[in-house]
UniProtKB/Swiss-Prot annotation:
GO biological process: potassium ion transport; tyrosine metabolic process
Cofactor: FMN
EC number: 1.21.1.-
Name of the protein described by the UniProt record: Iodotyrosine dehalogenase 1 homolog
Species: Caenorhabditis elegans
């Protein structure tokens, strides 16, 4: 007795249900013949089935090609990303580029500087130098108020400074509160006094008391209408997990301070660059600054008093600070 074998299409020997059972199709076609249908109708049905199978095959092939194309595009983008990162000397750690989104996705715009002839350029450079050579560290301030809008413009100018990866890691704290300035002054003076005493040990300290008071006191911290406290980031959270230290943020912020000093001189105000020494953490707590910030410098800001005295500085000539190659 013959065993009936079922021919399966798109099936395999794993026991999976086939997509198309040829035996069922054969029985269905026989039913057409038994019902008196013409052979032409059977051929039409077969043709229709063939067309359907062909369409299914074409769709499957198209989807397969599309998947391949997407995979190639993703691979190409990954390679291009690595090339861009390498060209910008970012390094191998992709976590670094997550902090610098503009490294990959920066948008370039036209840049045009006004065309100035050499005579005007020379004149402007000389005028700017004559203005900047008048700059002095001022420790005596008048009570004349400074409009807050002027302070904002000065800080906007400082914010134009370049920074590594355009992180702009600086924060400028503007203190006008007398009580806060008084607290900061006490902390600075206590720290400076301890620092000075540690250098002046022994009997000579008694002799230097009068000079000591002039040395460690910081009256300009409270005398100036404003006290600018310059902070910079020392780390940043990456994916809310990893903390990365940025040593170059101090360099970027220092450049911004240089631009700020020039802007201060340009508007006729005065300041003196003051280091926080070891008082930075205490000042940060007073200002409630986040833990990822460190205080770089303090800048009391205002108009110089009429009776102010400044050192008679002799700056090095340009030939002593320049090397031509």
């Amino acid at each position: 007795m013959k065993k009936h074998t079922h021919h399966k299409a798109y099936g395999d020997s794993t026991g999976k249900e086939p997509l198309i059972d040829l035996q069922s199709i054969k029985l269905w076609l026989n039913s057409f013949g038994n019902q008196g249908h013409s052979s032409e109708a059977v051929l039409n049905v077969l043709f229709t089935l063939g067309v359907i199978l062909f369409v299914i095959y074409q769709v499957a092939s198209l989807l397969h090609r599309m998947n391949k194309r997407v995979e190639k595009q993703l691979e190409s983008r990954t390679k291009q990303r690595k090339v861009e990162v390498a060209d910008k000397h970012v390094g191998d750690e992709m976590v670094f580029t997550d902090l610098h989104e503009n490294v990959i996705r920066e948008r370039m715009i036209p840049y045009r500087m006004p065309v100035i002839n050499d005579d005007i350029t020379l004149r402007n450079s000389q005028i700017f130098y004559e203005e900047m050579k008048m700059r002095r560290s001022c420790r005596q301030f008048s009570s004349r108020d400074v409009p807050l809008k002027v302070i904002q413009n000065l800080l906007k100018t400082a914010g134009t400074s370049p920074s590594v990866g355009n992180l702009q890691p600086w924060t400028f704290c503007v203190v006008s509160s007398d009580s806060i300035k008084t607290m900061i002054r006490k902390i600075l003076e206590a720290d400076e006094r301890d620092n000075y005493v540690s250098r002046k040990k022994g009997a000579s300290w008694v002799v230097d008391v009068s000079q000591l008071q002039d040395t460690w006191r910081r009256p300009y911290i409270t005398d100036a209408p404003y006290l600018l406290i310059v902070c910079h980031e020392i780390f940043r959270d990456v994916h809310s997990k990893t903390e990365r230290v940025f040593h170059y943020n101090q360099i970027s912020t220092s450049i911004a301070v240089g631009i700020l000093l020039a802007a201060i001189q340009n508007v006729g105000l005065s300041t003196v660059v003051t280091s926080p020494l070891n008082a930075g953490p205490d000042i940060s707590r007073i200002l409630r600054r986040p833990e990822n910030e460190s205080i770089l410098l303090l800048l009391p800001l205002g108009y110089a008093s009429e009776d102010v005295l400044v050192p008679d500085l002799k700056r090095k000539p340009v030939e002593h600070i320049t090397k031509l190659y």
